[in-house]
Amino acid sequence: MDSRERVLASINHEKPDRIPCDLWAEPGVWERLKKDLGAESEEAVRKALEVDIRYISPRYPPDTLTNGVKQNMWGERWEKTSTIFGVEWEHTRGVLFDAQSVSDLEAFPWPTCDQVDYSHVAEDVKRCEGYAVFYGNADFFERPGLVRGLENIFIDVMINQDMVDYLQERFVSFFIEDFHRSESTP
């Protein structure tokens, strides 16, 4: 049973030959795993640990860096912080944290799929043959929480539902188009 078959068996409530394995890690953890396993790359770590899932995504525009704060196309922001594993990027207030109305949300320069490079997606899928493939990161709740602030999203659900609806529409529409474009790459 290969990794793809193993994950599909589990999803279908069938018994796999072993429990499927996945791995997400921060940069400091990847470095430690590479060192401890004598691995040259993250992919070598995945193979050594028999990780069954591979992640692919299109290439998004590069993050910007202003005054030590990194921001992506969605307005998610990170600041460097020291941890016991080294310096990591930690989420900080997103660009829409102080928005008070739908018009404030509308004023943000929302990204479009035209800014995204899909040219390598088909090749990445081929490279992952035999593995379960997870595409993209269409997180319709977490991402709005990162650009708006999770606490603000919870408050908005109670008293600013129009803002929640607007954010959900923006993200869902983007990711539906994103999936369609990734499917249609040669």
Identify the residue ranges that each predicted region occupies.
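Catalytic cores of TIM-barrel enzymes
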Residues: 1-186
